[in-house]
Amino acid sequence: MNYQQARDFLDQLQFFKIKLGLDSMTRFLNRLGNPQQHLHCIHIGGTNGKGSVGATLCSILSAADYKAGFYTSPHLSSVRERFRIGNTYISKEDFARLMSKIEQVLDGNQITYFECTTTLALLWFAEQEVDCVLLEVGMGGRLDATNVITPLVSIITNVSMDHELYLGATLAQVAGEKAGIIKKQIPLVSAVADDDSGEVIRQTCEERNAPLFLFGQAFRGRVGEDASRWQYQGLDGQLLNDLPMAMKGNYQIGNASLALATVQLLNRQGWSINEEHIRTGLAQTRWPGRLEYFRRKQEGREDCPEGLRFLIDGAHNPAGVAALQQALKDFSFRQLILVWGAMVDKDLGTTLQTIAPMAGTIIFTRPESERSASPEQLQAALPPTLEPKIILTGSVQAALEQACALAAADDLICIAGSLFLVGAARQLLLGDLVNE
């Protein structure tokens, strides 16, 4: 099996619907020698911020000379983005070889796309003998394919409404699914709110005798005197001042604080990560497609010698879009040009009505996904009074061309609503993250 054949094999698994449950995953891993049993893992769940926490931890662990594996989803443009060690993505050769092994062991049995990528990640990390795996939950937690490990530390970033069809119609129900990654006597780090979801998390920790370390109580983070720096108060009360923050958005302080609390718990278990490692790791953290700001020069635009300004963000649920709206207040611009695409199963009205009033122009488009909402469906989610500033386009390419044609040097083009859209737009604007 070569790389293209491996991709084709994986892609055809998308036709199997999302399947929540661990029985088939457990049996399959057993046939592969249970690679997960040879790994030291940190399990990262929650509604928003999982990737940011994982990217921060990966950077800090790498700065401390640990071999850190990071498994995340979804990807922006290449499936190989889901698997990396430090800053190195899985090679085409390793991807194809391990996919071939999976196909042989499957022997015609059914597996989902996410079960397959999770299995490949566990195999690769075990084979590469990584020191630590940062394993991001795909959806929920209790029945997620990643929930086959016993981690060193569990993390639940936060809980808000998302994937209601699978996880439940109330915060408490969603929290119950995410609490499924809490293991007996394994510490949990969380920034869950003091609401129904927080009560579920606290109660589950008590039932499983899992030590709970809450942001705002056991540890804290806040903006420093210089807005580009921040302060962390740790589990032992120690203050770390004037910390760097490579990622944009004040909400990233909460995500970084979760990472630092996790680092402290690792140190309590015998790891060796010092303040210098933390500062270096924080300064070098990169997480593409999440409040990612850049300029791009346009041919024939002498009025924009430094290029047009872009901000791309994967916000796709009410809480994520609210965070994006808040972050936009830190940018100066004459006009906000919003390029938006979303999945039809999302809360289109709530998300759009949060951010649409900030925009001078709204360009709706449709990412390439069978779950994508049509531009007309997106327009219908907004009140008729906003129609004069709405433009409908049939492709991401057309949406970007329209946005660039309308934008002036002091405007900001914000692309958001779906990671499918962000991935496609980023690829068109900046090229591939991973060379395909």
Labelled PLM ranges:
Residues 71, 187-192, 338-340, 360-368:
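Short internal beta-strands
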Residues 123-126, 261-268, 427:
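Short glycine/serine- and small hydrophobic-enriched flexible loop segments
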Residues 44, 52-69:
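A conserved segment at the C-terminal end of the G1
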Residues 117-166, 198-242:
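Extended acidic/charged loop-beta regions that coordinate divalent cations
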Residues 1-16:
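Charged, amphipathic alpha-helical linker segments immediately N-terminal to NTP-binding catalytic cores
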Residues 194-213, 224-226, 305-312, 318, ...:
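C-terminal helical cap/extension that packs against the catalytic core
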Residues 38, 132-137, 144-155, 159-163, ...:
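Nucleotide phosphate-binding/pyrophosphate-handling subdomain across enzymes
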